[in-house]
Amino acid sequence: MDKKLRKAQLEILRIFSLRAGSFALAGGTALELYYLHHRFSVDLDFFSPEYSLDEIEELVKGFRKSSGYKIRLESDFKAGGKARVRFYIVSIPGLDRPLKIDFVEDVIFNSPDIRRFKGVPVYSVDNLYLQKITAITGTSPVEDDIGRVVFQG
């Protein structure tokens, strides 16, 4: 584990906990930090079904102001023709590799199950696993007539 990168992640998450609106931490770092503690994950993935560019810009502005890190937009696109995604690169003094932050439109959950850890909104472990299965299989979960979650696609 890169201790400087972890320190930067935790600083961004601390700032995020004070400013988060509709976005919540998801992905590998959410699993690693708050649930499994299984491996070091290097990026921060923030998901929201609302995906507001204004909110993203305010969060990034807050990250810059409070952390002092240089943050630049790397790319902005629609993944798979569905989910909007914005990738940012955070330059950390003394590190060769940057911290990567992405903001992703959640096209799987309209109302994700969000937990809070020290104020940080984090997707539930069930939601995280369904996202991983969806990403791996290329299918999407839907609820059938009697409330079971099934995959289609």
For the regions a protein language model found, what residue spans apply to each?
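Compositionally biased terminal segments of proteins
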Residues: 1-26, 30-153
